[in-house]
Regions:
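ATP/NTP phosphate-donor binding region
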Residues: 2-69, 76, 80, 112-119
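ATP/nucleoside-binding phosphotransfer catalytic cores, i.e., glycine-rich phosphate-binding loops
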Residues: 197-198, 203, 222-223, 228-317
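Cofactor-binding loop segments of dinucleotide-utilizing enzymes, especially the Rossmann-like FAD-
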Residues: 20-22, 50, 94, 239-241, ...
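Short N-terminal binding/cap micro-motifs at the start of the first secondary-structure element
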Residues: 24-28, 218-219, 311-313
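Short conserved active-site loop signatures built around small residues
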Residues: 72, 209
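Glycine-rich phosphate/pyrophosphate-binding beta-alpha loops
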Residues: 145, 149, 210-224, 287
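Short amphipathic alpha-helical segments
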Residues: 29-31, 78-82, 102-104, 154, ...
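Catalytic core of DAGKc-family lipid kinases
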Residues: 18, 41, 48, 87-88, ...
Length: 317
């Protein structure tokens, strides 16, 4: 990603801060502390908790930057609301995985360092995916997928994440989900999928299919190391039954804290079409459908394309 500068350095910036107060741990700054850090960096700030029912209305107010403090869930919600509005987004990573912030190179910096870096006004362009199907149309920031990861998300959500409730540390939660994925992989039955990518038929039996806008999915799992969120292309990860061992090794490396560079099949493209016949799909961190009976199980087409440079994110120097 090649950063570019916006605005003039000497101007005081007006920051709208959207904060998820449930994100982070005991060491994470509170809302008041975040406001103080932003003030001390020389900016004006308007605070909004994402727990307020009408928090989205704050995004209609004029500002120079929308800062988002929390995890990928709230970052994605804000980003989808700002598509095509050309308002820069500043991510403050305080979640479990922080995949978007990791993509932007922010997870190796402290929160005060990230906020201090805003004065440089460095932006990068960021694509969004668009998935049209039985749910109408939805944009995604991280990715869309089906198979092992999606089914595991669905099971965890159905149990209200009780398998992770005893864990307070974000890193422990990430490792626990990776271990659950690795265990489920041993007995997972591949899905038969009818797929075309830019007109090429790639139908087959797949353990996992992930349509990725960034390199990471879920628990910091790097499946598409060469994904670039501003190149106008999607990275589609195909894991067939024959590649089960490769995915298992990737999960094992991630559990051990190694920088996984999986030798999985990844294809780049602009348009993917999948015939949906009732299997579970995830769109970013949401599992669809909530109620399978809401849609007919006769085949429906999922059409996935790219909206190029529809968002801008701040990065640190």
């Amino acid at each position: 990603m090649v950063p570019f500068i916006f605005g003039r350095h000497h101007q005081v910036m007006r920051i709208t801060l959207i904060h998820n107060p449930d994100a982070g741990d005991d060491q994470s700054p509170s809302g008041d502390e975040l406001v103080g850090l932003i003030h001390r960096a020389g900016h004006a700030v308007a605070y909004q908790s994402s727990k307020d029912e009408n928090w989205r209305s704050r995004l209609e107010e004029s500002c120079d930057i929308v800062a988002v403090a929390g995890g990928d869930g709230i970052v994605g919600q804000v980003a989808k609301h700002l598509i095509d509005r050309h308002i820069p987004i500043a991510a403050i990573p305080m979640g479990t995985a922080n995949n978007v912030a990791r993509t932007l190179g922010l997870t190796n910096k402290t929160i005060p360092q990230i906020i201090a870096g805003w004065k440089e006004r460095l932006l990068v362009n960021f694509d969004a995916g668009l998935a049209s199907g039985p749910w109408d149309s939805k944009c995604f920031i991280e990715g869309l997928g089906m198979g092992l990861f999606t089914e595991t998300m669905y099971r965890l959500d159905a149990r209200d994440n009780v398998d992770l409730a005893h864990l307070n540390d974000s890193e422990e939660k990430v490792v626990s989900v990776l271990q659950i994925l690795k265990e489920r992989l041993r007995t997972f039955t591949p899905n038969k999928l009818k797929i075309t990518l830019d007109g090429q038929d790639l139908s087959g039996q797949y353990i996992l299919l992930e349509v990725m806008n960034i390199s990471y999915v879920g628990p910091n799992l790097c499946l598409a190391p060469h994904a670039h969120p501003g190149d106008g292309l999607l990275d589609i990860v195909f894991v067939s039954a024959d590649e089960q061992d490769k995915l298992s090794m990737c999960l094992a490396d991630s559990i051990d804290g190694k920088l996984a560079r999986p030798a999985l099949t990844v294809r780049k493209g602009q348009r993917l079409q999948i015939e949906w016949d009732g299997f579970t799909v995830h769109i970013d961190d949401e599992v669809w459908p909530d109620n399978a009976s809401a849609f007919p199980l006769s085949p429906n087409l999922i059409d996935i394309t790219v909206k190029r440079h529809t968002l801008q994110f701040l990065v640190s120097p």
